[in-house]
A protein has these predicted regions:
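C-terminal structural cap/anchor segments
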Residues: 31-89
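Short helix-capping/linker segments at secondary-structure and domain boundaries
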Residues: 45-52, 119-128
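Short active-site-adjacent structural elements
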Residues: 61, 89-90, 97-99, 110-113, ...
């Protein structure tokens, strides 16, 4: 269920459910490629495969984000592969996902991807989380505040 409550004049997005992350099948992200790493962090826990397509251009960002996402998903025990124009993430039992030292490749989106994984996988260590300063100068403080 998705709702948009307003608290103290600020509108929020609130999502509730049974904890199941549903795979998306083929999902075209042509118009929203920047969210691919964050979406990938969620889809690692999905019940069905997802092909994120229309994002081949992510190979030319701060790092080759498609290659980096595949490497890091595999590092935690997940299954992913590059597609000609995107990324496929296959479901695995969540108990097979494990701790790891996650590389950020000096890429702020990869750092947020890794920190999101740490919400569900214990003992994820993010190497160079400070790279998030590019878009969120106080990311670490905001993250710690959210978890407090």
């Amino acid at each position: 269920k998705v709702s948009f409550p307003t608290i103290d004049g600020v509108r929020y997005c609130e999502v509730t459910g049974d904890g199941t992350v549903r795979g998306l099948g083929s999902f075209d992200l042509t118009a929203a490629g920047e969210i691919a790493p964050s979406l990938a962090a969620i889809l690692v826990f999905a019940d069905k495969p997802t092909d994120m397509v229309g994002i081949g251009h992510l190979r030319g960002h701060e790092t080759n984000r498609l290659e980096a996402l595949v490497n890091e998903i595999r590092r935690i025990g997940g299954v992913a592969e590059e597609l000609p124009d995107g990324l496929r993430i296959e479901p695995v039992p969540s108990e097979t996902l494990h701790e790891a030292n996650m590389e950020t490749y000096a890429d702020h989106r990869m750092a947020t991807f890794a920190t999101m994984l740490g919400l569900r996988i214990p003992d994820i260590q993010v190497i160079n989380v400070a790279t998030t300063r590019k878009t969120l100068p106080d990311f670490v403080g905001m993250w710690n505040g959210m978890l407090a």
